[in-house]
């Protein structure tokens, strides 16, 4: 079982709770991160969830590289808009060979056509989208039992 999970959130996810609440809800990123960390703590087996958010592609790539050195066993990533554009993030995930779940709060397939393309989905262990913030809870549960 995985003991160390990295939860990565990309651009604009720092605005959760206030950004388009009709789409993304009113839960803040801080609340999502705290809930994920509490899930790990509740296992009482030394599991932990590290959290990271950045709006800059290169910093996200650097954080993925660092995860390998830290012994992270699983990544949960909501790459936001970079899902649809970033070969660099895809290559970083593949380069570390750390299994990952792609998560999105909204159902991207019910949105604009450009959001239907993901550079990550075909390499992800799973894709969770459209479950609201519960998608994070489900992802953490899966990752901690991987």
Swiss-Prot record:
<feature type="site" description="Transition state stabilizer">
    <location>
        <position position="19"/>
    </location>
</feature>
<feature type="binding site">
    <location>
        <position position="91"/>
    </location>
    <ligand>
        <name>substrate</name>
    </ligand>
</feature>
<feature type="active site" description="Proton acceptor">
    <location>
        <position position="24"/>
    </location>
</feature>
<feature type="active site" description="Proton donor">
    <location>
        <position position="104"/>
    </location>
</feature>
<protein>
    <recommendedName>
        <fullName>Catabolic 3-dehydroquinase</fullName>
        <ecNumber>4.2.1.10</ecNumber>
    </recommendedName>
</protein>
<dbReference type="Pfam" id="PF01220">
    <property type="entry name" value="DHquinase_II"/>
</dbReference>
<dbReference type="InterPro" id="IPR018509">
    <property type="entry name" value="DHquinase_II_CS"/>
</dbReference>
<comment type="subunit">
    <text>Homododecamer. Adopts a ring-like structure, composed of an arrangement of two hexameric rings stacked on top of one another.</text>
</comment>
<feature type="binding site">
    <location>
        <begin position="105"/>
        <end position="106"/>
    </location>
    <ligand>
        <name>substrate</name>
    </ligand>
</feature>
<keyword id="KW-0672">Quinate metabolism</keyword>
<dbReference type="GO" id="GO:0046279">
    <property type="term" value="P:3,4-dihydroxybenzoate biosynthetic process"/>
</dbReference>
<feature type="binding site">
    <location>
        <position position="115"/>
    </location>
    <ligand>
        <name>substrate</name>
    </ligand>
</feature>
<feature type="binding site">
    <location>
        <position position="84"/>
    </location>
    <ligand>
        <name>substrate</name>
    </ligand>
</feature>
<comment type="pathway">
    <text>Aromatic compound metabolism; 3,4-dihydroxybenzoate biosynthesis; 3,4-dihydroxybenzoate from 3-dehydroquinate: step 1/2.</text>
</comment>
<dbReference type="GO" id="GO:0003855">
    <property type="term" value="F:3-dehydroquinate dehydratase activity"/>
</dbReference>
<dbReference type="InterPro" id="IPR001874">
    <property type="entry name" value="DHquinase_II"/>
</dbReference>
<keyword id="KW-0456">Lyase</keyword>
<comment type="similarity">
    <text>Belongs to the type-II 3-dehydroquinase family.</text>
</comment>
<feature type="binding site">
    <location>
        <position position="78"/>
    </location>
    <ligand>
        <name>substrate</name>
    </ligand>
</feature>
<dbReference type="InterPro" id="IPR036441">
    <property type="entry name" value="DHquinase_II_sf"/>
</dbReference>
<dbReference type="GO" id="GO:0019631">
    <property type="term" value="P:quinate catabolic process"/>
</dbReference>
<comment type="function">
    <text>Is involved in the catabolism of quinate. Allows the utilization of quinate as carbon source via the beta-ketoadipate pathway.</text>
</comment>
